[in-house]
Structures are given as C-alpha cells and as structure tokens.
UniProtKB/Swiss-Prot annotation:
One of its GO terms (cellular component) is cytoplasm. The gene is sde2. It comes from the Eukaryota. Disulfide bonds: none annotated. Belongs to the SDE2 family. GO terms for biological process: cell division; DNA replication; endonucleolytic cleavage of tricistronic rRNA transcript (SSU-rRNA, 5.8S rRNA, LSU-rRNA); mRNA cis splicing, via spliceosome. Its main location: nucleus. Residues 412-446 form the SAP domain. The PIP-box (PCNA interacting peptide) motif mediates both the interaction with PCNA and cleavage of the SDE2 precursor by a deubiquitinating enzyme. The SAP domain is necessary for specific binding to DNA. This is Splicing regulator SDE2. Residues 173-199, 212-395 are annotated as: Disordered. It comes from Danio rerio (Zebrafish). Residues 265-278, 353-375 have a biased composition (Basic and acidic residues). It holds the Pfam family SDE2.
C-alpha cells in the first residue's frame, strides 16, 4: 500500500507499507531511521490528529510533526484572576441596557420617582413635628409644692406683713393728729420782739446766703436794679480795688438778729460807695493816660521777662477780659445816670467818650504786648541748645570738609544725611545707612589715603547698562 508522508524537515516522501499498518508503525519507521524518540512526534492527516492505533489509508497524505517543548505556564492563572475581578465589581452604571440608555440615567429616574412619591409623607411629618413643638412650648409647667416648712414660712410672713402695716398706719395717724393740735409755726410774726436767731451756717462758700436772702426780700424795685455784688465784681475785674471799709465785713460776724430796716440801710450805703469808687477810678484813668501807659509798659516788661519760663497769655483772652470790664462799667454808668439828682446827661456823654478812649488805648497796649511776646518767643529758639562744636561744624557746611579737624563722629552727625552721603561718594565709599552709621564710616577713614581704606567700606563699581 502506497501513501505520502511529510517529514519534520518538510520533505515530501512516497512510502510503501503493508496493508494492515497503523499510525504507530509509521512513527516507528521514522524514529528508527532518524534516531529520535517515539514520544517526540505525532501524526495528523487533513488537519486532524491521528491516533496511534488508526489504520493507514492508501493515497492519503500524513504529516509527521514534532511536539513543542512545554513552558512555565501561568497565563491561565492570570486569566482566572482577571475573571474574578470582573465578577466582583458591582458598579454597572456606566453600562447600557438593550435600548442603548445608560443604566445611571435609568436608576436616577427611578430614584426621583420614588422621592416624589414620598414628598407628601415628608411634608406631613414635618408639620406634625412643628405642631408638637408648639404644643410643648405652650404647655404650662406643672409645679408641685410639698414642702410644709416653706408653706408655713409664707403664712407667717403674710401675717407679719399685715401686723406691720396696721402698726405703721396707726403711728402715722397719731402723728398727724399731734401736728394738727399744735400751733402753726410756718410763718413767724414779724412784730414779735422775742424772735429767735437763725442757726448759723458754717458751710464753705455758703456764708453770705442768709444776708442775700433777707436783703432780696426787703429791697425795693429801685434797689434791685444794681446789686452790690455785681458792682463790686465789675470794678474789681478791670481796676485795682481799694481798701474796703468796715461795713463790708463778713456776714457771719454781723449779728443775725439785725432788723430788716438796718440791713436795707447798709445795702444802700454799699451801693453808693461802689458807684463813687467806679466813677473816681474812671476819672483818674482818663485824666492820666500817661501814668496808665507807664504801668502797662512795666507790666509788659515783667510778662516778657517771665515768658521764657511760662507761656505767654493769649491776646484774645486779654481783650475779652478788658471788653467785659468796659461793658460792666458802662452798664453802671448808664444805671447811675437814671437818677438825675447825681449825674446829668453831659457827664454821661463825657464818661462814655472817656470809656471809648480807654478802649482804644487798651487795644493798642494789647497789640504791643502781642508783638513783644512774639519777639521774645522768636529769640528763645531751640537753636540755642545746640553745642558749640555742632555750631562750628554747621557754619562750615558749604566749605570743603577736613576730617583732621573733626574730633568725633558726633560733629559729623551735625552735617546731615545728604552732606555725609556726598562726602562718602566723593571718597568712593558706601553711602547708605543711618546718620550715625554714615558718620562713623566717614570718621573711620580719618587721616587715611585712598589706598589705605578698608575694601569692605568701598562701594562696588557700577555695572554698565546692557544695550
């Protein structure tokens, strides 16, 4: 029987075998011929594997192929691990269903439908909670008092309160009855000769209240126009006050049992004396303006001499005080002119002219005082506190600086930042820093030539600008 065999070396052989031969006989023939192992080859025909006990057919092509060497393996384990991971995943929202829609969108639609179904239930629960909260707030707290001692104390306190109120009402009613039965002492009889003296007040600043109160009650309308206190204050504010007579003693020294008529008489005398003093001062000041000017000049010199130790008064305050005194004196003159028996209209006009002249003189003197105070303050300047060494250096600012004549950095500090910077730049040194640093740096090169200067003090050469 004749058949065709393709050997492992790709040779096409025509082989004649016995009719009952099998596939194993074919393999033995080639292994014996080539000297290889029987287990290293297998036979296939028409692309199918032939078994070892199959009979050979005539005219069929058989392929003798060697077996491949086995590897390490492991690819199957890798496939098994990957399959396990694929099976473990639970997020399949990125997948699509049969209609092509994302599972994520489908799930969201289902969740939204369920949420809308439960919306009414949620609103009902919310309203129920709100009503319960309101009921809890409106519910009144229930207090149960079971303390017998506390109840007994409250009962005792109420009884004591009633007793104390009754006693107080009885005491007040008895006091009112006694006050009604006694004589009325609200107003004393002025004709009573046995009038008791008032108790003297020794409070500070309250000494003349009794006399002022009694004088205001007994004074007439004409007397109330000009009071002694205002007239005395007006004259004493602008002019030196003369010695007061014995009638102006302390009201505490006078007997409190003096009659109203005597007090009225004393008040009239005081008013007359004050008017006479004011008119005499006005006439004397108008008759001798030169003397007043001399006194004012002396006062100005005294003020200027003391201006270095104490600040000068403001001219506005002086003018205000002088104008107040003038207004008060003119008011007194006008009030005194109301009585035609003492002054005539001509005298009033003369006094008014004199007052105007005095006002002009006072204004002039105030301007002179202001000028002198300004001059004195200008003379006393902080420049006087500068030491002599610094003043010498300041006088030589514009001159070329000679370091050999400088005794210390303190003198160089007086030159200022700009001058020190200029001197340092001329020597090629660093010109930055504070005033003290610049002065110390400049003083450190005293008596040194440019070659002897420390290189750390020199400025770095400036680099040219790149074009």
């Amino acid at each position: 029987m004749e058949l065709f065999v393709i050997s492992p070396d790709l040779k096409f052989n025509n082989l004649t075998v016995a009719p009952d031969s099998t596939v194993s006989d074919l393999i033995d023939h080639f292994t014996v011929k080539n000297g290889v192992s029987l287990t290293d080859f297998y036979v296939s025909s028409n692309g199918r594997l032939s078994r070892s006990n199959d009979l050979l057919q005539s005219g069929v092509v058989y392929r003798l192929e060697p077996r491949l060497c086995g590897g390490k393996g492991g690819f199957g384990s890798m496939l098994r691990a990957l399959g396990a991971q694929i099976e473990k995943t639970t997020n399949r929202e990125a997948c699509r269903d049969l209609s092509g829609r994302r599972l994520r969108d489908v799930n969201h639609e289902k969740e939204m439908a369920e949420w809308l179904k439960k919306q009414a239930d949620r609103e009902a629960e919310k309203e129920q909670r709100r009503l319960e909260r309101i009921q809890r707030k409106l519910a009144e707290p229930k207090h149960y008092f079971t303390d017998t001692n506390y109840e007994q104390q409250c009962h005792d306190l109420s009884e004591r309160l009633e007793d104390s109120v009754l006693k107080g009402m009885q005491a007040s009613s008895s006091g009112l009855v006694q006050a009604d039965e006694g004589p009325s002492l609200k107003r004393a009889n002025p004709t009573d000769s046995k009038k008791k003296a008032k108790k003297k007040c020794y409070w500070t600043g309250m000494a003349g209240l009794e006399e002022m109160a009694s004088s205001s009650e007994g004074s007439d309308d004409s007397d109330s126009e000009v009071s002694p206190s205002t007239s005395g204050a007006s004259c004493s504010s602008g002019f030196p006050k003369p010695v007061v007579s014995a009638h102006k003693a302390d009201p505490q020294e006078q007997p409190s049992s003096s009659s109203p008529a005597q007090r009225k008489h004393n008040q009239e005398e005081l008013q007359k004396r004050d008017k006479e003093e004011c008119t005499s001062e006005i006439s004397s000041s108008s008759s001798s303006p030169a003397a007043n000017n001399e006194k004012l000049n002396q006062e100005e010199t005294n003020e200027i001499s003391s201006s270095s130790s104490s600040p000068a008064p403001k001219p506005t305050e002086v003018n205000q005080q002088e104008m107040e005194t003038e207004m008060e004196c003119t008011a007194q003159i006008s009030s005194s002119s109301s009585s035609p028996a003492e002054h005539s209209e001509e005298e009033v006009q003369q006094t008014a002219e004199r007052v105007e002249k005095m006002a002009e003189e006072v204004q002039k003197t105030a301007e002179e005082v202001q000028k002198k105070t300004e001059e004195s303050t200008a003379e006393i300047s902080p420049s006087s506190s500068i030491p002599e060494e610094k003043s010498q250096v300041l006088s030589q600012v514009e001159d070329p600086l000679d370091l050999l004549s400088v005794s210390g950095p303190e003198q160089l500090e007086a030159l200022g930042l700009e001058r020190l910077k200029k001197e340092l730049m001329e020597r090629g040194m660093k010109c930055g820093g504070t005033l003290q640093e610049r002065a110390a740096r400049l003083f450190s090169v005293k008596g040194l030539t440019p070659d002897q200067i420390d290189p750390s003090l020199l400025a770095k050469p400036s680099k040219g600008k790149k074009k």
